[in-house]
Amino acid sequence: MLKAVFFDIDDTLYDTSGFAKLARKAALNVMIDAGLPLTQEEAYKLLREIISEKGSNYDRHFNVLTKTVFGEEKPLLIALGMITYHNVKFALLRPFPNTTSTLIDLKSKGYRLGVISNGITIKQWEKLIRLGIHHFFDEVVTSDEVGFEKPNIRIFEEALRRMGCKPERSVMVGNKFNEDILGATNAGMSAILVNSELTEAERDHVEKNGLDVTVIDDISQLKEIL
């Protein structure tokens, strides 16, 4: 019988990608109005390239953007971009429609809930607090804190250790096959893929290796299967 349910945060509990895209475009519009000599399409393409190269947790994307365009950093444009990005993102931030009710349901059934996330500890806690769901989780384990990123099994093993739970009595819920699903199953856990679909190659891997993987369209389906 399952005892613990672990969740990824981004694009699992809330629409990270959608909110970030809106916030980035709003920030670029403000920077363009203040003198960035690019169209929004050009600026967004460049920003996406920078994010792809540096990673989403890098905190100087706008610094790199202005240095690329001007040959030097432009503090005013950087500050305008950062302020707008954070203001818009936090104004929009909310869980997926069925996230909170699902967490309530799982807690009422006696499950212990945890988070396993690649990211900076304070930033991940800030997301959970702003989403209004931090109090549901018994443990929040981040790559920043433990020194290993998903899919490395050591971050899953550390989460299980803190929760005091065996892998066969735990399940990981996430939207990324390589990070969440493979990482969890390699650690001996079952896994549930949400807000995504298995590719043919991923499905073949699951079947060939006899992995305990379930695919759902919406987080609310956890109420039925757990």
From Swiss-Prot:
Alphabetized InterPro entries for the sequence: HAD-like_hydrolase (IPR051400), HAD-like_sf (IPR036412), HAD-SF_hydro_IA (IPR006439), HAD-SF_hydro_IA_CTE7 (IPR011950), HAD-SF_hydro_IIIA (IPR006549), HAD_2 (IPR041492), HAD_sf (IPR023214)
Signal peptide: none
Keyword Metal-binding: yes
Ubl conjugation listed as a keyword: no
EC number in record: 3.1.3.-
Function: Catalyzes the dephosphorylation of D,L-glyceraldehyde 3-phosphate in vitro.
Family from the record: Belongs to the HAD-like hydrolase superfamily.
The protein's name in its UniProt record: Glyceraldehyde 3-phosphate phosphatase
